[in-house]
Regions:
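Amide-donor transfer/coupling interface in amidating biosynthetic enzymes
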Residues: 1-120
């Protein structure tokens, strides 16, 4: 978890998270200027742990959000990590974070009001 102050990760206290990725061809790509803008705006939310970037995602990016903070795109599948019986319950923190945001306990808008940066 790169950014915890989001509507999607505010309840994620553990790091790293163990969440399965179930893709073989998908990977994140953006040019260097876009990446720099996204990093500066806190839009890179998740990165693969060291040695876990099996698909060549640029900058080890596993999840991003748009500049308004209300859209989250990610490669891992948190819905497949909700019960220890299946290997991990680490995905629950993502769903708990969204619940907190919907209930009004966390803002959906980034600190800059979503005014700066590139669209993702």
């Amino acid at each position: 978890v790169v950014e915890r102050e989001t509507a999607f990760t505010s309840a994620c206290e553990k790091a790293p998270l163990s969440i399965p990725a179930k893709h073989s061809w998908g990977r994140y790509y953006a040019d260097e200027q876009t990446l720099a803008t996204m990093r500066a705006n806190g839009q890179v939310v998740l990165r693969y742990a060291a040695g876990e970037n099996f698909n060549g995602s640029v900058d080890d990016i596993a999840g991003v959000r748009n500049e308004q903070g209300n859209v989250f795109g990610l490669m891992p599948h948190p819905e497949h990590a909700v019960d220890e019986l299946t290997g991990s319950a680490d995905g629950l923190c993502i769903f708990a974070s969204m619940r907190l945001a919907v209930e009004g306990h966390h803002s959906l808008t980034p600190p800059d009001g979503g005014q700066a940066g590139a669209r993702v």
